[in-house]
């Protein structure tokens, strides 16, 4: 036997060899590739007649492909021959054949992923950026259940750089109709990548996916660009330019200033302020379109002669500038308190000595106050002023969120407080230096007055070596002061909770609300009765640290015998009951039935295909749900590869948007939003907790929603009653998305979802028209981009 080589070419990280085989023995040809003792991926594709194409990765090593003719038994296998694969030879011949043998090249290049072979393809659908690597995700076309054991990643030198046994959908009951979704982490900076799968006998399946160096870099860059949020947007300055006040608009604002508008006291503590920073700061106040202000300059370093001279120069030119000179530095809190005592304004604005303002910030604040004179506190969106004078890293903030402000001082700038409200709180002492503004926000929030957010970039926070904007380690004491500020706030309110630093992140705080051990939770779990799914669910619950809970499964009577038998064999200390109904599976109705059977104080509605990520998950959820002002608390759900499924839900245009979907759960995302406890528009239905009394007050779930938007409708009903809807990432779960909560086929699922969506839009049209107060309207109106916290750019039309 022999193998005849008829031609070579390459493309897309693969090498293609056209060969002729003697098939007279009627046996099936197979190819096996190796480099030394290392087995490598390879594919043998039939072209026509006795001609085949050997497909191998474009590795920078000498590969050897053996071709065997297989019979029914192992002893019937016949060695047909081998070919040596030298990548450098293919580089030369591919160029020549591309010109001289075009028809041959067109016939064999990409043969393994085109035509009828497309159905057997191994694809890579994209990459998700993560720290020091990428998550590659794709599909293996319709393998038999359990036949694929592992996906392996190689670099261009045939070195194994990643292995994964993670398949995202291998638990689906209708798996046979599906492609197998894989996920594997690979390193950055590779000069090429090959992804291949091996079966449970250790053999490579035929198809594999390759990227040459250029293609891999392109995929890497594309993934970072695709997932880049607004804070990383390289075109942000273009966006800012199109949203800043124009000269014409400034002129109009100056002519519209109402008589009797509030006086703003802009308080600036100065400490060794660089002269250029001072000029920028003071000029930005002088350029305000709203004229009714005073600038209080508290100079704690009068020995800085040049700075003192510059201060006096500015004060002599405008009577609205007032200087308070101290004998020495009292610390940021003490210096600020002196400025407050000197202020005579209706509102106190706290302005850092090295930052700058947009010219319309006071006008926008005055306009908001004119519309609502009872506003106690105002803040706006902001960005960073880089050392080179450019602007970057915009912070688009939500409206006031009490849970988020306990997590971190996202309010930040330009913090402006009604003087009358300030006089009702106790001034902070030096122990809160570095967190004095945060403490003030928390104290003002306790008054119960109005807190207003102006969703415009009106403040520029300068990045410098001594500012926390550029170096969070520049004020190491500030995080400890922040912990104290939040703890004192909770203590004043009589809320039993412990505050600590959140996962070692600067200026981030974790609040653990204490849970009464007598509080009982009922886990209400609608199920289709898949025993493998239920077994995994129970195993996931066994590590739960909080012990006072029960499970209420809800199922159709057609599967009840299997569920009851499974429950009887469960080794759990907690009670498990089964609510059985003859009714067709309707998620909302099944949840209502389970709630009626539940004995707990707090209902935790869960899908049966979730797995808690931390032992404290339930105690964390109960801590939030037990708060009287909270109506419902939801969690982060993740895919098995630790990419985020959702980190809270928003509403954009006409769609419910799963926030941060597809991003790496270990990355900060947009300004740590996915990792931040905060109030949200709605919680996801995979797992959420609510007090039973609140559930009954709302009137249970609306059974008009069959399988979709049940938790969204419930969240909106709670918000209408004045309850908070809270999201916490500290109680995250894996969501396998195996169980289908619809009685329809695949086409029917879409129709049912559309019907449920129409019901949601109809029922809540007035509320939905107001948008999502917890999601900044500067983000994109395209749901997919909004999910990634991206902004839209106005594309300029050019004429040729």
Language model features with spans:
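C-terminal, non-catalytic tails of nucleotide-sugar-dependent glycosyltransferases
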Residues: 216-260, 477-518, 641, 652-680, ...
